[in-house]
Amino acid sequence: MPRFKKGRDLNHWKTNRPDSDVGKLRIVGGVYGGRQIGYSGDPVTRPMKDDIREAVFNLVGGWTPGKIVFDLFAGTGAMGLEAISRGATKCFFVERHFPTVKIIRENVQTLDPDMNASVDASDSFFWCRKFLKDPASWPTEPWLVFFCPPYGLYVKSKDELLELIEKFKDAAPDESLIVVESDKRLDVSSLPDHESWEVRTYSPAVVSIFKKF
């Protein structure tokens, strides 16, 4: 069985930072910590809340430096930007919603015009299939892969998502991490090699983490 743990009360992670402004999110740690990034406010992007993102990076942050990041179904791009802030060397952002892609590109330019980032306006399923078919293009450094799709896809496209997660798990180099954000509609025991995942609940979010050794 997956290792279930209730996420620590989010009040534990809260500091005296004011809440993010409407239309803004905040990088919570690393070299860009405290800086705001743009957010359209469109619920289609459903960004992970600052406090949940902080809790997640308290779990994986020590593994982040030197990683190649894949922020799939990127939405606001906050996960990838947070990872870059905490020492990841490059991020591939993949998001199909064109207005949001524009905001991700603006956020990259605002934080660091020289950031090592690739922002692709593409369907994540299509992009991943193309990427996975070309092993010569795979980075050899360990990966940090974020799967944070709209929760409804775990119902509408469950099998396709699980297949994609499994393929990334198999393709990733040793020392890689995979982070899957879902809600309770995903039975985490259906994740590939499900006994190896650590699962935390930050209601309504369920965060599952796989470390490849």
Give short role names for the model-derived ranges.
Residues 1-213:
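Class I S-adenosyl-L-methionine-dependent methyltransferase catalytic core
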